[in-house]
Amino acid sequence: MDRNSVIGFSLIAVIMIVWLQFMKPEQKTMLDPVPPSREMVQKDAAENAPASAAPETAAESLGSFAKASTGTEQIITVDNDLFTAELSSKGATLKSMVLKKHLDVNGKPFNLISEKNKGALSMLFLSNDGKRIDTRDLYFRSLDTKKSETVTGKEKLSVSFVLDVDASRSMQVTYTFTGDSYVIDYDLKLNGFGSTLAGNEYQLDWDGGLVYSEKDTADESHNAISSAYLGGGLLKLDAKDSKKRYQEEESGKAEWVAVRNKYFVAAMIPERETEGVFLQGTKKDGVDFENYTAALKMMIPAGQNSVTDRYRLYVGPLDYNTVRSLHVDLEKIMDFGWDWLTRPFAEYLILPIFNWMNKYVTNYGLIIIIFAFLIKTVTWPLSLASTKSMKKMSALQPMMKEIQEKYKNDPAKLQSELGRIYKEAGVNPLGGCLPTVIQMPLLFAMFYVFRSSIQLRQHGFLWVKDLSVPDSILDFGFKLPLYGDHIALMPILMAVTVFFQQKITPTTQTNDQMKIMIWMFPAMMLLFFNNMPSGLALYYLMFNVFSIAQQAYINATVSDEDKAAAAMQVAASASPSKGAKKGGKKK
């Protein structure tokens, strides 16, 4: 590998490390209380109450809703092709969501909704008598007599809960499930509530984030956020510091609000125009889990006594094609890096090719190998041109050293003469690193795809159990600086291929330089890839294997005639000027 390639890779590695640490999405930290009309969404109201305050009775805390504070909870289980959900009559909320096709790190089904919470969904509002109402504190009655329901294929099933506040006011919540979909239709019907809600507004709230499912909880915590999409822009909130309280509140029409962990998302998509959104996040000391809230703020039109609001809930995997099919830009919540560089590579090249190949090849390890071969084939002309350029550069080395020695005290003249030699020999000094530079955006994009795409999750290849995480063969139990807390085998094999690739690639370096670089660069890449997804290391390993084969072929077929031609071309162009000088002396 030539010096320019080494420098390019080195700079890219440094940029990548710094970028991962410091170029995370900027978050706003709001430490001041929100206006009183918005405090109904604060879950810590009770925690901030004076210690000496006596507990409120139901009548004091719930006002006209007090009679609904007692009752018997009824759980209704809905089973479809993709998940098993539990609905509770207390709060008419979603209590549990267990996915069938996605397991946790131990290979077992897991509940995406925290069992510590009272449920994920609730309606929050401030009543006209000043009471903060969370419907999860109220007992609804179920309109269904069955405790368990099953729906398959394109069939639909509805489950409804009703709360009769008094003779003139009622609330009805209806969940509609489809047998083969993660989407749940959620209808909220308010009758006689025109004079009940302070400010004529309420919030539909998803509380508690999503339960983590991966072994590396710190990494999953890094991916967990609360988010909203409104005004054509993505609003993110990341509670990364346990000493701060994070919240965001924006007005306007929202396409959706959502909470996510590394591979799963829960999104609420309104049918009617929203008043705005509210996001909140907290993190406790010594715990990786981050607790998130996402809420849609809805306004009941003035003079309207009743309203029916319809929403779509998506609770399931962050599969690009699936979330994109909702046509609300929910795929924007997936982190593919820079929108202007790596995201287009991910969305319009990597994922489409992977999805197409997956129709014919089921093993993602093989898909990665085929993809590496395709990329190497596409870059073949560049590699050939790069090799020829390096051979010419090698032929020019004696002449360049002579000029460098001659004009060492005249930098301007030195650069002028070197430029003349490059031009007359038809050599681009940066041509050797062009293939490397071109594939870097692709490599970055693949890092994001392999790291966050659920397609690779728990898909193995040979000894690798999960291509989306490092293929650790030995865990230390402690962290080494730069290297990490484990030994991954795939990066070691990849570093070996980097070593051999350098050995057979033409270079303009001196022997001393080559000795240093041939060991330093593989070591640097080993450090860099040890904590990367094993799928990415597999791609680069196979790309290097194909590069070695390609380089061996080029070395065998591209003769040294280019070297001689380059030297002769420069010598011929230099001769006339020398002859003119000699002729001048004879005169």
UniProtKB/Swiss-Prot annotation:
GO cellular component: plasma membrane
Cited CDD domains: 5TM_YidC_Alb3, EcYidC-like_peri
Transmembrane segments: 5-25, 365-385, 430-450, 480-500, 516-536
Predominant cellular place of this UniProt entry's protein: membrane
Domain of life (superkingdom): Bacteria
Location of this chain's protein in the cell: Cell inner membrane
Keyword Protease part of the UniProt annotation: no
GO terms of molecular function: membrane insertase activity
Keywords, sorted A to Z: Cell inner membrane, Cell membrane, Chaperone, Membrane, Protein transport, Transmembrane, Transmembrane helix, Transport
Bilayer topology term: Multi-pass membrane protein
Single GO BP term: protein insertion into membrane
Assembly information from the UniProt record: Interacts with the Sec translocase complex via SecD. Specifically interacts with transmembrane segments of nascent integral membrane proteins during membrane integration.
Role summary: Required for the insertion and/or proper folding and/or complex formation of integral membrane proteins into the membrane. Involved in integration of membrane proteins that insert both dependently and independently of the Sec translocase complex, as well as at least some lipoproteins. Aids folding of multispanning membrane proteins.
PANTHER family: CYTOCHROME C OXIDASE ASSEMBLY PROTEIN COX18, MITOCHONDRIAL (PTHR12428:SF65), OXA1 (PTHR12428)
Recorded family membership: Belongs to the OXA1/ALB3/YidC family. Type 1 subfamily.
Protein name: Membrane protein insertase YidC
Origin species: Chlorobaculum parvum (strain DSM 263 / NCIMB 8327) (Chlorobium vibrioforme subsp. thiosulfatophilum)
Lineage, opening ranks: Bacteria, Pseudomonadati, Chlorobiota, Chlorobiia, Chlorobiales
